[in-house]
């Protein structure tokens, strides 16, 4: 809108009436290239207010109109069934065939894009889609963006090779990464991927848990030694710690005297195959443990202890699914405890709040808070069979419909109708660092349609798609969540399992179901076979020969 490059942090100037009229990103203390110093900017703004106030008023009006235009997506009724295929081909064409991920630098994980490509492979059988996903995961999991000592992924890579990260660790990135890696592992059974899920979720519980059960937001990039200082190594440090074993470790993790980042070494395994022999991996595990213990003596980066509903929703979903897929009760318990924490301390008169910090919950929830927590509730239902999670999801959908829906143009606003101090209410389906709330709502509404049999949820999902059909038709990769959800709505797959959830045969059926890495698939497990409404997926079904039974349904 202002004709300058985006970035962060955002610096905006507002009128006394709180209307934005000009802004930028970072302004240095001294002029740098074509960027003025911050004091020069302040001086210019002061001059405008004193001598050219009309220009500020004109700019504010123009910016307001531009924001309103951006907040009004092109409307085109729905998406034809064949659109998913053409969209997936377009996304595949912009993937990096050498290093994986979207082309160029900096490189972000872009998990919704990877999920869409995986979905395209499961639908079409074209191996190019699968290969694009596995290539990206291999490079991310072996690159410097991954913390090879402590587990967990950094925010993004500053280069196209996934080597040098921006060292900040975000809860939402790690939740999304473990979700896609778990999905791919269900198909490939690659032990390397299992290791990365295990290390990352163990890191999440170890370093991101807050008292009571929720998860903190981030771990900063900066530590007292500067950005990344906590994570990088000089060769002589490793030689001192590992002694005669250092040569083997240095080859495995790309360590050299000159370093690969500002004279020091970011550990990575990009030059080696994912896993060596079991004996060699055991040796490396011992070496990593020694370095991890030594690193713990350094002053660590600061943790942002805020508990955010939306990011916790993503973490809960990943932990719940991975806990079931890998049979890890600790992860499953962590998912349930975090969900209970949100419901216990972050609800006010039945409505979600966005943030909890230092014992206080505050700030009105956004669409993303509800969408991700509904997704979390449904993930917990799928993995536990506890129907109270479905009830909670339905309650939250009702709140969204009452306070967030755009009754004129369809879809959901990012903020509720009773929020204050906003110059406009935005409504978008674009993914950013996290999936789009509207795209996620299509997915969860489609899931609710499958698990309840109530067509009203399918209709609501279709209405959201109708609201953003024109945007999706432009082919932006940032609409991956919405387009993936459209395919789920048009090709729903529901596996209904009847039997004792703790019984050996039922567990075997659940395990076989999770071996099918189908993004469109919803799994429901029922022990209670009491009468249900005619449209309910359990209606008319019973165990065959008194044995646990699975029904595959296409609603």
Language-model segments: which ranges?
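Catalytic nucleophile-loop/oxyanion-hole region of alpha/beta-hydrolase
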Residues: 193, 331, 361-364
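Inter-helical turn/loop segments and adjacent helix faces that build the functional surface
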Residues: 120-124, 184-192, 322-329, 380-387, ...
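Glycine-rich, acidic and aromatic/proline-enriched surface loops and short helix-turn segments
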Residues: 139-146, 337-345
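Long, polar/charge-rich, low-hydrophobicity segments
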Residues: 206-209, 344-371, 378-531
């Amino acid at each position: 809108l202002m004709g300058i490059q985006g970035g962060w942090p955002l610096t905006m100037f507002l009128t006394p009436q709180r209307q934005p009229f000009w802004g930028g990103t970072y302004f240095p203390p001294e002029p740098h290239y074509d960027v003025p110093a911050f004091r020069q900017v302040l001086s210019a703004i002061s001059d405008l207010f004193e001598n050219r106030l009309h220009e500020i008023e004109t700019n504010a009006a123009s910016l307001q109109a531009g924001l309103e235009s951006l907040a009004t997506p092109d409307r085109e009724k729905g998406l034809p069934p064949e659109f998913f295929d053409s969209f997936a081909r377009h996304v595949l064409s912009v993937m990096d065939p050498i290093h994986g991920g979207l082309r160029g630098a900096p490189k972000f994980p872009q998990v919704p894009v990877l999920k869409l490509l995986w979905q395209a492979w499961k639908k079409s059988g074209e191996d190019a889609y699968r290969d694009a996903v596995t290539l990206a995961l291999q490079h991310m999991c072996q690159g410097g963006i991954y913390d090879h000592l402590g587990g967990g992924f950094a925010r993004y890579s500053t280069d196209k090779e996934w080597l040098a990260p921006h060292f900040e660790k975000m809860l939402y990135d790690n939740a999304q990464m473990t979700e896609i890696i778990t999905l791919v592992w269900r198909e490939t059974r690659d032990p390397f991927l299992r290791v990365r899920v295990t290390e990352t979720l163990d890191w999440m519980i170890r370093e991101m848990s807050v008292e009571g059960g929720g998860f903190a937001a981030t771990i900063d990039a900066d530590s007292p030694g500067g950005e990344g200082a906590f994570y990088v190594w000089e060769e002589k440090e490793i030689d001192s710690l590992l002694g005669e074993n250092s040569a083997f470790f240095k080859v495995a993790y790309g360590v050299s005297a000159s370093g690969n980042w500002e004279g020091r070494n970011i550990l990575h395994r990009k030059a080696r195959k994912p896993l060596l022999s079991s004996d060699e991996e055991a040796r490396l595990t011992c070496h990593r443990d020694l370095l991890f213990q030594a690193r713990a003596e350094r002053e660590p980066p600061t943790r942002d202890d805020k508990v955010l509903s939306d990011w916790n929703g993503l973490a809960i979903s990943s932990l719940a699914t991975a806990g079931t897929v890998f049979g890890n009760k600790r992860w499953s318990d962590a998912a349930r405890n975090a969900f209970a924490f949100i419901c216990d301390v972050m609800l006010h008169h039945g409505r979600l709040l966005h943030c909890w910090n230092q014992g206080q919950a505050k700030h009105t929830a956004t669409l993303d808070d509800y969408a991700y927590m509904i997704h979390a509730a449904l993930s917990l239902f799928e993995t536990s069979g506890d129907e109270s999670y479905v009830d909670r999801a339905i309650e939250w959908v009702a709140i969204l419909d009452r306070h967030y829906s755009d009754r004129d143009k369809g879809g959901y606003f990012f903020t509720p109708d009773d929020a204050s101090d906003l110059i406009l209410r935005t409504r978008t389906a674009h993914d950013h660092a996290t999936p789009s709330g509207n795209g996620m709502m299509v997915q969860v509404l489609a899931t609710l349609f499958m698990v309840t049999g109530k067509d009203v949820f399918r209709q609501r999902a279709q209405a959201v798609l109708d609201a953003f059909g024109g945007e999706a038709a432009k082919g932006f990769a940032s609409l991956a969540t919405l387009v993936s959800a459209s395919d789920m709505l048009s090709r729903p797959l529901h596996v209904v399992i009847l039997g004792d959830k703790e019984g050996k045969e039922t567990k075997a059926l659940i395990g076989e179901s999770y071996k099918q890495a189908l993004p469109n698939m919803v799994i429901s497990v029922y022990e209670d076979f009491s009468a249900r409404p005619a449209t309910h997926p359990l209606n008319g079904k019973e165990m065959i020969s008194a044995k646990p039974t699975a029904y595959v349904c296409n609603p």
